[in-house]
């Protein structure tokens, strides 16, 4: 089998295609979550706190910053000055926690639907096929009914 045909067989398997779709949707979902945090949640938090909250401006300068360089995270990094940008980390952490919670809720919902389907199938099977004892009792009842007539 040639390398091309092996790759084609691998790439067209259902699991690989499902994974590719999941990765693409996950990337888009991460962008949505980032926008949710930056454009919706943080402005609400800033309104409640009574001021603007910008985690990007939360950092520690590690070393000396030369004169004339603005004291912002982006300007210091552009100047090559080491900066401990813990505010950016907090933003990424909030994004992750929201994304993880949403995925957890989705998995929980899917599991609930699966369990409901399994219970429904079990009920249908139980209704469709009576147990051996029930079948035996029905046979005995039918024979007794024929004798009494």
UniProtKB/Swiss-Prot annotation:
Which regions span the lipid bilayer?
Answer: 10-30, 41-61, 87-107
Q: Tell me what topology the record assigns in the membrane.
A: Multi-pass membrane protein
Cited Gene3D superfamilies: Large-conductance mechanosensitive channel, MscL, domain 1
Q: What is its main location?
A: membrane
| Localization (cell) | Cell inner membrane
Q: Name one GO cellular component term.
A: plasma membrane
Q: Which UniProt keywords apply?
A: Cell inner membrane, Cell membrane, Ion channel, Ion transport, Membrane, Transmembrane, Transmembrane helix, Transport
Question: Has the keyword Ion transport been applied to this entry?
Answer: yes
- One MF term from GO for this chain? mechanosensitive monoatomic ion channel activity
Pfam families per record: MscL
Q: Which HAMAP family match?
A: MscL
What's the subunit arrangement here?
Homopentamer.
For this chain, the family text in UniProt reads: Belongs to the MscL family.
* Function text: Channel that opens in response to stretch forces in the membrane lipid bilayer. May participate in the regulation of osmotic pressure changes within the cell.
What this protein is called in its record is Large-conductance mechanosensitive channel
């Amino acid at each position: 089998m040639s390398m091309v045909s092996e790759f084609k067989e691998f790439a067209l398997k259902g699991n690989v295609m499902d994974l590719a779709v999941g990765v693409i949707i996950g990337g888009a979902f991460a962008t949505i979550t980032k926008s949710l945090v930056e454009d919706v949640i943080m402005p609400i938090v800033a309104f409640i706190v009574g001021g603007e909250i910008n985690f990007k401006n939360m950092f520690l300068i590690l070393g000396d910053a030369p004169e004339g360089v603005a004291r912002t995270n982006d300007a210091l990094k552009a100047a090559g000055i080491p900066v401990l940008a813990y505010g950016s980390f907090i933003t990424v952490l909030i994004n992750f926690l929201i994304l993880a919670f949403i995925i957890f809720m989705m998995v929980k919902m899917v599991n609930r639907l699966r369990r409901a389907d399994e219970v429904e199938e079990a009920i249908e099977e139980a209704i469709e096929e009576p147990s051996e004892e029930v079948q035996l009792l029905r046979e005995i009842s039918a024979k007794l009914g024929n004798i009494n007539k």
